[in-house]
Amino acid sequence: SGNMAAQCMEERDWDIVLVSAHLGARYGDGGQNPGNHFWWQGKFYSRTGRTPDLPLFVESTGYGTGEGLCGWNCRHSFGPGDLRHNPYAQFDADENKRAFDLSQKQRGKESRIRRTKTKLVGLRTAIEAAEDAGVKVTLEAQYTRTAKLLEKQNLDYNQFCEDNGLKRLSDRIQIAKWTREDARKSIAAARSK
């Protein structure tokens, strides 16, 4: 979408750019650089330099780089601006930092849950393929321990979201090969013994 907005502004020879803003924008090292999305969000920029009172768009936002606007995991957008209408609220830096840090902790918990589910799927496949009874018993014990870990991780994730007023994002804890049957077996194993 960033490329389309830039192309349309170039075709229309539009100079003033308005960048969107949201609570929880990454703050990088806290400096005035493209990695600090909080610093450059919700402001007007000059695309070409024709508006001397405004900072340059690409240099300020890092548009076109991984760390900048429309880069890695960036949720910001931009479009033509008019210097009069800016619907984006300015957020308190501490409030923004707290929201970003909480979202990063939430992403970490989601990643660990996905990793544990992947391990459980692999263990279930290994158990089903095991021909040696001793190996099968060892794998089943490991499966039970891992299922208990998953149950603990899910409880921790739900409590973390509730304690911090965050929405549980079930799509972020799904993996491709995790079925209802896998969930049922995992819960049964976690509650056994």
Question: Which residues fall in each region the model found?
Answer:
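Domain-core detector
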Residues: 1-69, 82-193
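Catalytic core of tubulin tyrosine ligase-like
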Residues: 76
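Extracellular structured ligand-interaction cores
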Residues: 73
